[in-house]
Structures are given as structure tokens and as C-alpha cells.
Amino acid sequence: MDKYNLIIGSHVSLKAKDFFYGSVKEALSYGSNTFMVYTGAPQNTKRQPIKSFKIEEAHNLLKKHNINLDDLIVHAPYIINPCSSKKNVRELAKEFLIQEIQRTESMGITKLVLHPGSRLEQNEDIALEQVYTMLNDIFSTINTNVIVCLETMAGKGSEIGVNIKQLKTIIDNVHSKKNIGVCLDTCHMNDSGLILDYYNFNQYLKEFDAQIGINYIKVLHINDSKNPCGANKDRHENLGYGTIGFANLINIIYHPLLNNIPKILETPWFNVNDELIPLYKHEIKMIRDCKWYDIKNKLLSKK
């Protein structure tokens, strides 16, 4: 592990008045060397002008702390559904995704995580075709270095992007290979039915490499799960408090095939004295030390 380049961080906020500059400061307070942001609220399309983001100040602070822009992540909003059964919804999704790609590029970031969407009453093949058709339309419309990273999903409702076969179908049919990648989410993988112990995760990576190519994995979301394997529910838990377990997550984080790939925490905030606080700083320290401790009990005992 001494030679392992651990790139670890969390989701951080991007809000007035410091915007991107404030995101960097928040990430540094957690001991991170990467982070992920939404460019606005994930539930809507309302966005502030990119000129207000304090990009130059953010870049200067990143450079001061030797954080590589290529290791940072933007997450597209949840409302983008590339495989909606309604054409007007797909058109809105395409136009807004183009704008998100352009915002991501303006920030100097090269990775944009996208939920592949929910097919609703459509069959799987049609839904998958709609996703790769939209991506092909986008990449033929704009020239960009941004990589759209399809997130592995939990299988809640009619979600797609749940398994390697679905991801392979999309990636095989996207013409601009430089613009497509995958984000592995450990909670979603568990909830979709994948056992994430050492042996089974190795088998998953072997299959992924054979079917798609390990080089397409661009980012990981590191979360424990509140649910049993195969629950198809998607409820994140703090590291070591869920059904995946800290030891299994450490094996994933430090897997030799995943060296130099950013790992992002999206774990829940914790209620202490009626105040919700992030545990990212503590979780990142545990990851760096490869040692778990009961931070929740420790914080509650200070009441």
C-alpha cells in the first residue's frame, strides 16, 4: 500500500458566495485530495452564471495544495433522464446535459457522473438505445474533453445501468470512446445484488475488464449500505456501519487495479446535539489509516 496513490475525497457543496472556491476550501477541511460537486441543486435545472463560480481562485488554491483538476468530479443532476418514454423529457435532458458538460469544462474538470436513467414502461433495449443515441447526438454536437461517467445503479424501480451487460451495450454503441466512462458506486452495487467481499469483487473486476475494459472505470463512489445485498433500494450508510463492511470497502479502495482512480464518499451526515454534521473528515482518516473506529459513539459521548 505504500506505493498506492490514494485519491480520496467526498461530495462537497457549491454555493454562494464562494461557489467553486468554497468547494475547494471545504474539501481541504476534510483532508481530501479530490472532491465531487453538483453545479447547482441536483433536483432542478436552476444554475448560477459560471462567471460567478470564482474559478481562478479555486484553481490557485488547488495548485497550492497539489490537487489535480483531472481528479475532480462533477455530478449531473438527478432530473436528467436520458431514457424517459417522453420525447420532450429526453430533449430537455439532452439540452441540459450539454450545458452541464460545458459548465464542467469551464471549471477545468474532465469527469461528469451521470445516472443512466429509468426506463419506466419501456423495454430495456429501447431504453439503452435512447441513452447511447443521446450521448452520440451530444458528442457530435460539441467538441469536449469531458468524460461522461455512467454510474452503476441499484436497480430501484426501472433504473438501467444496473449490470455490466447494460453498461457494455451503452459503451459499445457510443462512438466517441474518449468521452465515455463508468463510475462504480459500492452501495448501488451491493443493493443490485453484487457481493462485495474480496473474492467476488475481484471476479466482478475480471468480468468488467473482459466485457468492457478496466480503463473505462474513471471514478468510484465509496458508500456502505443500509440494505442487505440485492435489496434494490439505494440507501447509503457511513463506512463500517452497513452491510458491506469497512474491511471490504478498504479492499475496494486499495485494489491495485483501481490505483490512481478518484474515490468519493457520499455517506450520510450524522445528528449530534440536533445538528447534522458530515463525517467525511473522520472517514477519510480511517481510510488513510486502514483502521475503523466507532466515530458515531465517540461523537455522541461528547454530548
Curated annotation (Swiss-Prot):
**Could you say which EC number(s) this protein's record lists?**
3.1.21.2
Catalytic EC class: hydrolase
What biological-process GO terms show up in the record?
base-excision repair
Q: Catalytic activity annotated for this protein?
A: Endonucleolytic cleavage to 5'-phosphooligonucleotide end-products
Give the cofactor note text: Binds 3 Zn(2+) ions.
Residues at which Zn(2+) 1 binds: H75, H115, E151
| Xref: Gene3D superfamilies | Divalent-metal-dependent TIM barrel enzymes (3.20.20.150)
Per the record's keyword annotation, is DNA repair included, yes or no?
Answer: yes
Q: What terms describe the molecular function in GO for this protein?
A: deoxyribonuclease IV (phage-T4-induced) activity; DNA binding; DNA-(apurinic or apyrimidinic site) endonuclease activity; phosphoric diester hydrolase activity; zinc ion binding
The signal peptide, as residue positions, is none
Q: What keywords are assigned to this protein?
A: DNA damage, DNA repair, Endonuclease, Hydrolase, Metal-binding, Nuclease, Zinc
Name the residues that bind Zn(2+) 2. Answer: E151, D185, H221, E266
Q: Which cofactor does it need?
A: Zn(2+)
Q: Which domain of life is it from?
A: Bacteria
Q: Is the keyword Metal-binding in the record?
A: yes
Entry-linked InterPro entries: AP_endonuc_2, AP_endonuc_F2_Zn_BS, Xyl_isomerase-like_sf, Xyl_isomerase-like_TIM-brl
Q: Which residues does the annotation say bind Zn(2+) 3?
A: H188, D234, H236
> HAMAP family under this entry?
Nfo
Q: Which NCBIfam families match?
A: nfo (TIGR00587), PRK01060.1-1 (NF002196)
- State the family it belongs to: Belongs to the AP endonuclease 2 family.
Q: What does this protein do?
A: Endonuclease IV plays a role in DNA repair. It cleaves phosphodiester bonds at apurinic or apyrimidinic (AP) sites, generating a 3'-hydroxyl group and a 5'-terminal sugar phosphate.
What is the designated name of this protein? Probable endonuclease 4
Tell me which species this is from: Ureaplasma parvum serovar 3 (strain ATCC 700970)
